[in-house]
A protein has these predicted regions:
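Extended alpha-helical scaffold and adjacent linker segments that couple domains
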Residues: 1-351
Length: 351
């Protein structure tokens, strides 16, 4: 399983003999190395064919793996180090930045080595830089995968937030200077609290989350409810004003959800024509962050919709993909919050 990567070509080692023959490398690493040497311009094409692969493999063994423990394999960052001994200044600066960022948190993951691993995979263009592939390529001890993967995930999240990495379709890449500049511009776009509250209400309408509960049939009788936000917005086709379901916004629940539930139970205990829905808010911070990010990516799309620079246009296209992915994730989180809500009616509460 350590050699089974998501890629454009088969990577899995199929026999013990093949596993042993390539040790301390994995066979697939030579495919990656060849593509990386060509795409990174580390060597010209004739050198790749004649000497590049041999020279790099020898240097990895001589410099990177000479003191390694028996049964450990060559990590991707060791290959990257010897395949590109003089990375561009901008890339070297990214390595240093990532190293400093991760050095300030409690993690065993080295920022520069993580970025080298990602650079090797992304530039090879044959193995996708997903969390799983990055982890498998980063480690030397293949038995440590499940211990290291959560640390890699945490490190990737931190470096994405720091604008060192971009993630799109679950694939990670190191940001270019232009991408970094646009991301910094996007970060400065303010998304006020009232904007986020309004956006959540609009999303609840767009999802049509409450249409199915806006009417109820009992025999030949049909009862239509007014489903309203706690600010009075209609969240479903308008029903009877005498039967109301009030839906609270995630932004209007206090720090202690149960205290809010108890307060609503007291204030509505005599209202026979009114029920109240309190969403489950354990994912509130993530939802808040996602709403902000989606609005910021949308701002960048709108601002650069007529951009003439082809490089910027390409980045904005990537931003659109990222926004769409975050919007889907946001929908799942919001729907889960309201599907797991607490319903309050006449002092009673139920999930």
């Amino acid at each position: 399983d350590a050699t089974n990567l998501k890629s454009a070509f088969p990577t899995q080692t199929n026999s013990e003999a093949e596993f042993a023959a390539y040790y301390p490398f994995h066979k697939y690493q030579f495919n990656i190395l060849q593509k990386f040497l060509f795409s990174s311009n580390a060597l010209v094409a004739t050198q790749i064919a004649a000497r590049g692969m041999i020279i790099t493999a020898f240097d990895v063994l001589r410099k990177q793996m000479k003191d390694t423990e028996l049964f450990n394999f060559t990590p991707g960052h060791a290959i990257c180090t010897e395949a590109q001994t003089a990375p561009p200044v901008a890339l070297a600066n990214k390595y240093d930045t990532a190293k400093q960022i991760l050095a300030n948190i409690k993690t065993t993951v080295k920022g520069d080595l993580l970025l080298q691993t990602i650079h090797l995979l992304a530039d090879s263009e044959v193995v996708y830089a997903t969390v799983e592939n990055i982890t498998k390529s980063y480690i030397s001890d293949i038995s440590s995968y499940y211990d290291v993967k959560p640390e890699i995930e945490k490190a990737l999240e931190i470096l994405v937030d720091a604008k060192v990495l971009l993630v799109s379709n679950h694939h990670y890449k190191i940001t270019s200077d232009l991408e970094g500049k646009l991301l910094e511009e996007m970060k400065d776009f303010p998304v006020e609290l009232f904007t986020k509250k309004r956006e959540l209400t609009n999303l609840l309408k767009d999802y049509k989350l409450f249409h199915s509960v806006a009417s109820y049939s009992e025999g030949s009788d049909t009862f239509k409810f007014s489903v309203l936000s706690d600010q009075g917005d209609d969240l479903a086709p308008q029903g009877s004003p005498d039967l109301r379901l009030n839906v609270y916004s995630l932004f209007n629940i206090g720090d202690v959800r149960q205290d809010h539930i108890d307060q609503i139970k007291m204030s509505t205990q005599a209202k026979k024509d009114e029920a109240t829905l309190i969403p489950e808010n354990s994912a509130f911070d993530e939802i808040d962050k996602l709403i902000t990010e989606v609005k910021r990516y949308q701002y960048m799309e709108d601002k650069y919709s007529n951009e003439a620079d082809p490089n910027k246009r390409q980045i904005i296209r990537e931003f659109r993909i990222i926004r769409e992915e975050k919007a889907k994730h946001l929908r799942r989180k919001i729907e889960a919050a309201y599907n797991d809500a607490t319903l309050i009616y006449l002092f009673n509460e139920q999930l």
